[in-house]
């Protein structure tokens, strides 16, 4: 009687350092994949505009039949980059939308707009392993005018890990520099937008950094 083979479940997580080619392991004939593209940076601001939050990276899930030893091209998107597995591609900026930053002079002061939530990899099939959505949008920066109207908050980043937009104090008769948006903190998240600057000579605010993507390969192999 032949001994039973042990079957091992694998969730293989790839980063940009793994870019190149991935070879199908021995005994593997089906692979379920989740691709998350990189999130976009939040926008800069100036004395006319608040920065919008960066859009999150797109999320793509699928299953393919494979054969051992066959190689597939792998590109894990860094910030603002697409993620690719073979012929499949998740697009940067196609995830949760970033919160809009109010544009143009002459608007009323307002808080930043929130970013949209991301999406669950594998359609939330494995919530114990991947409990949070990926590819959230960043929040927009606050829009102020220098009218002594108090503090305006930045938009909340989308769930999970979108960068928050920058808030700012609306104070009169001073130069107010734009403030930096918050950095994204989870796969595919967009950065937060910068708050609007006020008065001539004010410096622009910088948008927060997006977060890189990830590729996850799920398969069963012989132990």
What is the meaning of each model-derived region?
Residues 1-32, 63, 214-223:
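Enriched but not universal
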Residues 32-223:
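Low-complexity, glycine/proline-biased repetitive segments and flexible coils/loops
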